[in-house]
Amino acid sequence: MQPTVTLALLALIFGLTASAHHSAAAFDRSKPYEMTGTVHSFLWANPHAWISVDVPDGKGGSDTYELEGPGLNGMARSGLTGHTLRPGDKIKVVVAPYRDGSKRGEFMAIFKDGQQLKF
């Protein structure tokens, strides 16, 4: 009986860890907003894509936002690649902001050249 209980507890612990990794609790999806800026960098790496976007700050400078995206498998099935976005591209992004107010978030939609990139 002891090995069964131990095995069940381990399965529960590892299951909770995996669930926490895929949690969207850090993002406030109830307050999405749009931003327009220039791609600083685009990282196509497992488990998620990342975009750094330079957004004008209204004072002549810019702020860089770090945006996390969905898993690569889904994006690739939609035809996106690691070369879809390049530094210097002008994009509009719909973002779910981080709850802590930092310049980070989750990209929910991307528009490039007036067209929405599907993923």
Task: For each feature predicted by the language model, list its residue ranges.
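Conserved hydrophobic positions within beta-strands
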Residues: M35-V39
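Short, structured beta-strand/loop micro-motifs enriched in basic residues and often containing a Trp
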Residues: G69-R77
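Short aromatic-glycine-enriched beta-strand elements
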Residues: A45-P56
